[in-house]
Amino acid sequence: MIVIAIIGIVAAFAYPKVNFTQFRVDAAARTVRVALQNAERLAVTRQYDVVVSFDTVNSRIRILEDNNNNATVDAGEHVIYAPLEDSVHFSVPPTGISGSVGGPINGGTIKTVDGMPTLIFHRDGAASSDADIYITSKRASSDDYRCVRVIQSTGRTLWWRYLNGTWEQASL
């Protein structure tokens, strides 16, 4: 019984030091990465374009199975929305991985579809553009920024954390 009481006291002191926001932002980065990986895989499997649009206003990702490859939502085409974690949104970081940043979604040839920045995955798995997608928490602390990077030629995704003023590649 005494051991349980000691564990409870130690836990009470440790609880305020746990950074739950960091876990939410990490989960949101994984959500973005998984959505992009699934879109790429779907494009290769189904052999048509999959259009991924970033709804920066509503903090969600729209995934369109574009059967006729026209980059617009038509009748009969399947659309899925993937919301970001609670209190996480797309945002411009203090500095980008490769220098200055113009917006939360950056890339060489990012398209705009229905007023949203958009990547298109083609049937060979390649993306329409390289891209850096930046997210953060509502409090926007500098250590809360995350980035998911898409490599255009292969559609491969990587994710990064902004910690202590530098970008560090994260795993899983």
Specify the residue positions occupied by each region the protein language model found.
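N-terminal helix-rich module
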Residues: 1-4, 9-33, 37-41, 49, ...
